[in-house]
Amino acid sequence: MKRSFYLFNPGIMERRDNTLKFTPVIVNEDNEEIKQQPRFIPIEDVAELYVFGSLRANSALFNFLGQKGIPVHFFDYYENYTGSFMPRESLLSGKALLAQTSAYQNKKKRVELARKFIQGAAWNMVMNLNYYNRRGKDLQDIINTIKRLSNTLPDAKAVDEIMGIEGNIRQAYYTAFDIILDDFNMGSRTKQPPENEVNALISFGNMMCYTETLRAVHQTQLNPTISFLHTPGERRFSLCLDISEIFKPIIVDRVIFKVLNKHALSTSHFDKKLNKCLLNEKGKKIFVKAMEERYDETFRHRSLGRNVSYKHLIKLECYKLLKDILGIEEYKPFKMYW
C-alpha cells in the first residue's frame, strides 16, 4: 500500500532503477558536508513526498516522479508551505474547467457554494465540541454561539459576508480549546509565526490538511486555482483552502486534542524563540504519525454503505463538488454524524 514519506533532514535524492535513494547530509563545524547512511525507498511504496529540509535533486528524478504520478510538497524552515511539484494533469477536462469557471463567475452560485463550505465546517466544529461536552467539558455556551452564527449564513448575500461570519464562528470555536486541553493554553489564534504550542500545531496541521486536499483535487477534474469561498489568487491553490475548511475540525483538531491530552507531545517537542514557537524534528515526527493514523482511520459511510478512510473522504468531497459544478447532483458538504 502506498503511503506518504516525510523528509525532515537535508539531503540528496536520486533515482536508482525503480528505487528512490535518499542520502541525509549534515554540515560539521568546518562547514564540510558529511553524507550519512543512505535510505532506499521502493517507488511502488510512495504516494507523495513532504520535504522539510533542503533537498538536492536533478531533473531526471523529477521526470521519474512525474511519470509515476508522485507529487512533492515543499516547506521552509518555519514550516510554511512554499509549493508543490505536481505530475502532469492527465485528468484535466475542458468541459469541467469551463463549468468551474462559470460557477465562479456566477455570483449566486459562488455564494451558494461558499455558504455550504462554512455550513459544513461549522457543523463539524459543533460535533467536535459536543463530543467533549458529553465528557464533562462545559462547552454548551460556545456550541450555542456557533449555532446562532451558523443560522445567519442563509441570509448572507455576498462571499465577504460569509467570510465575516466564518471568522466569528472560528473565533468562538477557538475559545473552546483552552477548556478541552488539559495542560496547554491556546490564547488567541496567532500565525506566521505561531506564538505557542497549540497555535504551532494548528498551523502545522492545517498545512498538512491543505496539501492532502491538493492531492485529492489533483486526482479529479477540478482546477485547484478556481475557488468559491477564498479569493482565487496567484501562487496558491485556493480551492484546497475551501474544501479543507470542512475537514480541519474532524481531522486536524481532533489529532491536536488527542496528542496533547494523551501526552504524546510535551513542551520538549517544541522550539521557542522570542515570539515564535515551532515543532522540533522529534515533535514533527510524532504529530505526522498521528495525522497519518487519522487519515487511515475508517468509518461506515451512510451513503456508500461501506467503510471509507478520512483520506478517501476528502477525495469523495472533491467528486461531490465536481458533480454539482457539472450540473449532475447538488453539492452537500460532509457533516459528521457520530
Task: Name the predicted role of every residue range.
Residues 53-124:
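A surface-exposed, charged beta-strand/loop segment in the N-terminal or early-internal portion
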Residues 41-56:
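Extracellular/luminal Protease-associated
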Residues 31-32, 56:
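Glycine-rich, highly charged phosphate/nucleotide-binding loops
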